[in-house]
Amino acid sequence: MQKLKKINNYGLLVDLDGTIIQNDEFISTRVKRSVKKLSNHIPVSIVTGRGPQDVLKFSKLLNLYGPQYCENGTSVVDATSKKILDVSLISDDISSKIIKEFIYSEMEYLVVSDGKTYINSKE
C-alpha cells in the first residue's frame, strides 16, 4: 500500500465583517497583531461578501499579500497587483430565474452585482 504524503500546505481564511472588523470598520490592535503573527508563518486571506475595493483596503491595512476572496467567494483578487485573478459567476439566465423566484415568494434578498449591493428588505 502506498504511503500517503504529509500535506504541509496550510493557510487561514478569515471573514471580514464581524470577525476582523466590527460595525465601526476599525481593526483592533489585538487583531492586527494576531493576523501579523499568523501571516509570518502561513498565508492569510480575507473572504468577504464585500467587493474588491474593500478587500484590497483591509488586506493592505493587515499587510496581507496574495489572493483575497470577495463578492462571497465569486471573485479572487491579488492583494499585491490589485488584479482580479478569477471570477466565477452565475449566468444571467439562472440569476434572472432566481431573482424572479425571490420576488414571487416575497422573500428578502441581497444581490451583489458589479461591486454594488442591492437589498430587498421587509423593513
Where are these regions (language model features)?
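Short helix N-cap motif at coil->helix boundaries in the Bergerat
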Residues: 22
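Active-site phosphate-binding/coordination module
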Residues: 26-123
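Non-catalytic pre-domain segments flanking phosphatase-related domains
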Residues: 1-14, 37
